[in-house]
Amino acid sequence: MDNNNNNNNNNNDKNDKNELNKIKVAIRVRPLNSRELGIDQKIPWSISKDTISLSQNPNINFTYDYVFGIDSNTIDVYNAIAKSIVNSSLNGINGTIFAYGQTSSGKTFSMRGTESIPGIIKLSIKDIFKSIEDSILEKDYLLKVSYLEIYNEEIKDLLNPTISNKKKLKIHEDIYKGVVVANLKEEIVISPDQIFALMNFGEERRHIGSTMMNDSSSRSHTIFRMQIQSTCKQNGTIQMSTLTLVDLAGSERVSSTGAEGVRLKEGTHINKSLMTLSKVISKLSEEKTQQHVPYRDSKLTRILQPSLGGNSKTAILCTITPATTHQEESISTLQFAKRAKRVKTNYKINQVADANTMLKKYESEILELQNQLVKSEEINSLLRNTISTQEISSNNFKLGMKRFNDAIIGGSLINENKKKKKRRNTLDPSYLLKDKIIKKKIRKSENQKIKKIKNSENNISSSSSNSSGEEDDDDKDDENNYSINQDDKDDSNYEDDDDEDEDDDEESDTDNEDDEDNDEDNDDDDDDDDEFKDNLNLIEPLDDETIKKIKDLDDSLGISGQVKVKREDLDLIYEELEENKKLIEEYESTLELLNNQLDEKEIEHKELLIIIDQWEQECTNRENQNQELLEIDQQSKQSIQQLNDKLLETKQQSKQSIDQLNLQLIDIESESSKNKKSFENVLGVFEKSYRLAERLEDKYFTKEIESKKQIETLANSYLQLETTYQQQLNINQQSQQKIQSLNNDIEQFKLVWVPLKDQVNGYFQENQMFKQYIIELEEKYNTLIDLQKEVEQNYLTNTLEQQRNDQYQIEINQLTTEYNNQIQQLESTNQKLQTQLYNLLANATQSTQTLEQQLQTSKQEIDTLTNEIEQLKNQYDIIRVDNDNLSKESLELKQILLSKTQQLEEQLSLAQQQKGNIEIIQQLESIIVDNQQSIDQLKIEFDQSQQDNQSIKQSYNQLESTLTLAQSENQRLLTENKQFITSLNEIKSLFNSIQQQKETIQLEFNQRLQSWSLDSEKYKEIISTLEQSNQKSIESYESKSLEFQEKENQFDSLLTNYNQLFSKYNDLATSNESNRLEFDQFKKDSNQSIQSLESLERSLKSENDNLLQQSNLLKSQLESIEKQKQDQLIPIQLELESKKCELSKLSSQFSEQTKQVTQLLISVDQYKISTNKLESQISDRNEEINNLKLKAIEINALKEENISLKDQLTKLKKAPKSQTDREKDMIKKELEKLREKFNAIDAKLKQAIQDKQTIQSEKQSLEREIKDLKRSHTSTETELDKLKKTHLAADVKSKDFIALNKSVEILTKSQEQLKSTIIELESDLSKKNIELEKKQEELVTLNQDKLEKEKKTNQLESDHSSATIKLENYENQITQLTSEIIDLKSKFQEFKSESESNIKQQEINLKESNDLNQQLTNDKFELTKQLSDLKVEFDKSKQLWSTRSSESNDTIKELQESIISKDKERQLTSEQLVKLTDQINLKTWEYNDLNSQCQQLTKTLQNVKSSNEQQEQSIVSLESQTSAKIKSLELEISQIQENHRLEVLELNRCKNQLSEKQTLMEQDNIQLNERIIQLLHQKTKHENEILSMESNIIDLENQTKELKSKIETAQQDFEIEKNYHTGLNETNTTTIKTMNEELTRSNQTIQQLLFKISKLEQTSLQTQQQQELQQATISAQQQKQQQLADDQEKQQLYQKIKLIEKELESTKQKNLYITEQFTLKESEYLDTITDYVCKEKEFEKSKASLKTSATKIQALNDIIKKLQEEKPQQQPVVKVSSSQVVNQNGQPIKSILKKPKLVIIPREQLQQPPQFKELTLSTLNSNDSNCEPESVSASSTLTSLQSISKYIGKRSEQTTLEHDLTSSTLNLPLQQQNKKVRLVITKNNKTSTDNLTTTSTSLKSKSSSNGENKENQNNNIIIKNN
């Protein structure tokens, strides 16, 4: 069973870990203080469930696991956060709870609490012991407790403060325990009272101070840690866990707290540690792998390392003050909590399978203890050996001294000037060798054992040594060095001196740090040293000759007794000298050691000074380099500015040149009709200017490239400087490490101060003892006064007094001698102590002076020293005051004693006179002796105290001198700091200048952007005007072209068949060329469209990729959600299974309880039956009572009869005896009968009383049953209420609750029915009781009348009264119960109303969810609609495109393949769109799947609810279930609620995400639609442009190529500019980043320096420099805020710049496109102008020729007429072949018309009709008849005449001309045939005329057909002259 339980617990813990692996975060808002209520009365925070937000700005929302308002209790907080952690800590899971917040926000209140309101710590301890009591049978527990505080970054043990005072506690790492504080006291704990006592003990020693914010603010972080070790009794498995409860000190502002001095120092340390904590949590919340987390920056984070993101289940309680004044601090705490909420932990069960590990641990501890014992034994043996060696050496020395004495007694004299041999020769060297060998062996054994111990420790904790701190490594290095030095020293030769051996011994002693050696080294004075040296100079070894002489003298002279005595004295003196000499040698050795150490430290100091100088030089070099870099940056910026200025100048020049060119173009357009050469010159100028612009741009780009190279070189140099800077930082770190090692040395020197402090404390204790002695003396003085009073009564004799006085004087003299001896001894000891102190102080002062000169970082220690000195000052002042008081008191005592001694002498003189009372005198004498002894002791002690005071004064003077030195050093450091501050200010000024430069650059950039935008607007305006002008010209051109076309058709009709054929041929050639050019143009356009489509495809692909990524993200999120839900469903399923088991149990219990209910119903029925029986019994009893009444009447009658009989008896007495006897017999018989009747009546009465008692007992039983029923009813009601609460929380649907309500109503109805029946029964009972009472009263009245003397009646009355009292009590109880039932009903109704409101809210939520689903479906439907619309639009565009393509296919059949390819490409795009739609459909399917999953979840919830319904049905019968099970069910249901709430939140989040993604999809679709529309517009534009540009392609190929090349160069230039700008932006961003990093570093350095300055200035300039520091911190914060604002502005500007760049790119593309079109149109326009000019000239020539021809024709007609008149008989002319039509220049018209030309006539010229001036024909030569006639085309003349007649408007003249012409041709004479015209004569006249007409008509028809073909070929009318 236990294994199963453990497995279940493990599974539950795993599930909890999967669900709750994040840190639990709760917020608690405390109520307002009295101080805060006076300032502001409104609370700006609004709290709703798990969120907290600002009421003014609701956008600032924060959601957490729990949020507790002002009215919250600590018990609720504990149950929400801490209880689960405490319970899991008992199962082997580590747990931590800590409170975080501002000062005076209620952290200690919530953690510690008070006596009335316990905090989290007390509640957790109580729960731990409760759970231990519950599980004692299963497990054994071992609890250990430790309590520490972190005060000013120093760890202090609150349970053992002496250790923390003696030495610093260090942090280590252990494999099993983790991060551990070494030498921390751990108390084994049995009860909670013991823990509370330890906590109180620690709280008394905790640092607590008062500030402006809080009267008792905690000035340190406290960590209460409990180690819980539990072992299972069956398996033996061990579970280890630690529960850490942390009370953090609050973050504080100096301005709000008003901290000064020590408080400011404490506040800075607190803020520093909290900053590191926030850094750690921010790093952990980022969820990045392989990142550095700064745990080691603070001791708090180092200790709490496993709790923060490690093997621990943690919870954070963030407390907030609701006042408006602390709004910023509260927001910062909330942000901290938000970051902490994202931190994940990896806690696990710390379980050990076997007890082997513990055994190993204990074995290792035993080994350590054994090793320590071995060490102690070896040390003892060493001491013994040293003692033995000292004894041997002393014996040898005694022998030498004896010899020396013999020599002195012999009378020999010692020559001091002689050379003396060394003392070593006189001694026996074997002893020294033995000593050396023994010492070496002992040292070797010690070293070997130490190494073994270290190896064993390393084996035990192999991993802990690797992960231990830097301090441990330093200690190990020191130990290794020590052992190496010892080995090196031990390996020295035997021939070394004794002094060196002694040095080695003393070095080992000093390394072991024994205090006894320090005491022994400093025992004697300097004067004694000089005397001993003189004696030693005397006591040196003698020569052999002198010794022989001394022996001879001894032999010759005799040794007298006096010499023996002197020798003994000399022996004693020599022994003392030996001891003194040893002490001197040891002292000298210690001095040498100290000197060596001082030399080493001086060397180290020099090295450090050299390093510091190097560092300072490097810093100066770095500063110089930085300045050089800044100068280079400035130069580069200036060069960039110059380049930009040049760019601007070039751009302005180019703009000016372009403007000038535009003006010139306008002028040229106006003057184009006049001068063509000027136009060509302008083109040349334009090309030259363009070439100049290109050259300037090339120069600019070369300069730009050079500047880029310069910038790259500067960047490389900057990187090199950064590397050098990092190297120097590493060097600085190494120097800091060395400084830390020196600090450790200082700490070791500080240990020297500890015995001094102990001595001072001893002196203080001795002073206290003196005070006690004085008090005792005062008491004794009072006794003396009493004795003196007795002495006044008794007069003593003078003789005895004199004798006593003599004895007293003798004793006083003895005491004075003893006193003087003791004083001398004390003075000697005092002098020794003073010398020791002086030496120690001198050494300490030397060491501190050297170290203080070495280190600048020893400021804190100087401060601590100053504090200690201040304490010593205070102590000294106290001691001085005490000593002054003592001196005064002693003087007063002396005076009193003198006065009293005088009085005693007077009294003794009187006593001598009287001579009596000897015994009294003896007693007085003894008292006086005692008093004198006490006085002597007091004098001795007083002298000692004076001596101690003198020594303390000396030490105080020395300390004052050290203080002065420290203050001078502080002043020096202050000056250095001021210099540093000035340098910082200079850096700040430089930084400000850099920022100003940045701002100027940004302004320039903005100005450039504005200028670019203005230029773009100007270009747009120009383009719009040009487009308008082009449109107008095109419209006019179209109108005039129509007119011109008509004229052209008329002109073409006059041309001959030859010209027609030639024109056809030319038309075919031109059509081929135009088709080719159109094909090329179409290719280009198609390529452009393909490129645009490819770009579209790319964009669509990118969008598709984004959509795919989003879909993948959605899928991953959905999968994660599904996994989470599955993970959550697993515990729910397990819980369901457990609940099924419980339901089975509950069903069994339900069945049992149904049985109980049935039994109760049966009992109720029985009760009813019993009541009926009782009613029947009561009726029977009433009948019996009536019978009894009748019997009572009979009894009265009998009494009356008795009375009558008595009367008769009296009468009969008077009668004779016989009669009396008879009568007596008769009376006896009657009396017996009466007695029998009376007995029967008594029996009946007894039965009635018994029946009454039985009725009362039955009544009581019924009352009990009723009470039980009521209790069960109340219990069922309470259980039902609880079950309703639990099920209402679990239920969601209203139907379930309605069913519950119905069941509850049924129960309530049944209960009400039961109540009504009970009330009815009670009313019946009360009625019957009343009737019984009445009847009983009647009985009582009867019995009182009849049987007053009988006791039974009294008992009945008393019973009846008690019964009535009980009934009354019962009635009162019933009334109370009814009132309680009414209250319960009211509560039940309230609960009903609340439940109904909850149901309504749930229904509203369901409706909202349904609405959301509907909205989602509507959005889907809308999306599908939009997609369908897009498809329709796409199809329409397809159709349009197909129609246009079909129209183009009619004219250009050769381009069908390309169009088909385009159609294929469009199909591909459509397929892509279809794919997109498919993807959208897939996403909709995925969304549907999500909905289906949600529905499945709802189904599962419904199933759960159905199971809950079953539970409800089962719970209706759970009336007698225990409260513990109900509590467990409540907890489980609350967990389900939390899970459900989390699921709902997740679903809402998913919905929100889906809605956001849908909105994004909609936006994307809108963008796609816009893009499609744009593409359609572009297509239409392209089509129009294609149709408009087909005719103008031939002459524009070269120009387009040139323009393309120019455009490509311009694009390249633009890309280069863009890259340059991007490079500039990147450089700017990099520089900004670097500057920000430098700013942060400088801020950090500034903070550190300000912190150091604040520490240094505490002693001298507290107030002024604190204000400066405050201002500096405020300015730093403002700078930080400004930096943040600047960064935000930079980001915004960067985004704006990006947008502007995009817009510029788009505008540039548009401009390029417009310029291309403009150039094309311009070239076309110029070509049309040139053609038009040529045409005009030709027309003028043709007009002149026509005039001449007209004159000639008239002449011909006249000639013809003449010829007809002269020779009418000649035959008519059939055919007239006309000669060639010639211009004025003699050029034939045929040759002119062969050349096809494109003529584009502007509107202004087309508005006026063409003016025909002359029309010339060649004259007819009629000289020779034999010459060949010139061929003249009649059709040309006809067409020309027809055209003229059309323009003139005289159609009638045409017929006449034709008729005249025909007639003239027919009537030509035969004589003129051979001259100018060749006449072809035919027989019939009609045929000739017909042929002429047919030819003319055919010409006309052909010309018209040609014109139609031309119109079909080109929409733009082009005139072709053949």
Swiss-Prot record:
GO biological process, one term: microtubule-based movement
Annotated spans, Disordered: 448-538, 1887-1922
Composition bias type Acidic residues, residue spans: 469-480, 488-532
Knocked-out gene: effects: Significantly impairs the rate of cell growth and, when combined with a previously characterized dynein inhibition, results in dramatic defects in mitotic spindle assembly.
Low complexity composition-biased segments: 456-468
Induction: During the developmental stage.
Principal localisation: cytoplasm
Highest taxon, organism lineage: Eukaryota
Coiled coil start-end: 562-1712
Location(s) in or outside the cell: Cytoplasm, Cytoskeleton
Annotated GO CC locations: chromosome, centromeric region; cytoplasm; microtubule
GO molecular function: ATP binding; kinetochore binding; microtubule binding; microtubule motor activity
Domain Kinesin motor: 22-343
Keywords assigned by UniProt, alphabetized: ATP-binding, Cell cycle, Cell division, Coiled coil, Cytoplasm, Cytoskeleton, Microtubule, Mitosis, Motor protein, Nucleotide-binding, Transport
Residues annotated as binding ATP: G101, Q102, T103, S104, S105, G106, K107, T108
Protein family membership: Belongs to the TRAFAC class myosin-kinesin ATPase superfamily. Kinesin family.
Domain text: Composed of three structural domains: a large globular N-terminal domain which is responsible for the motor activity of kinesin (it hydrolyzes ATP and binds microtubule), a central alpha-helical coiled coil domain that mediates the heavy chain dimerization; and a small globular C-terminal domain which interacts with other proteins, vesicles and membranous organelles.
Protein role: Microtubule-associated force-producing protein that plays a role in organelle transport. Its motor activity is directed toward the microtubule's plus end. Cooperates with dynein in organizing spindle assembly during cell division.
Protein name as annotated: Kinesin-related protein 4
Phylogenetic placement of the source organism: Eukaryota, Amoebozoa, Evosea, Eumycetozoa, Dictyostelia
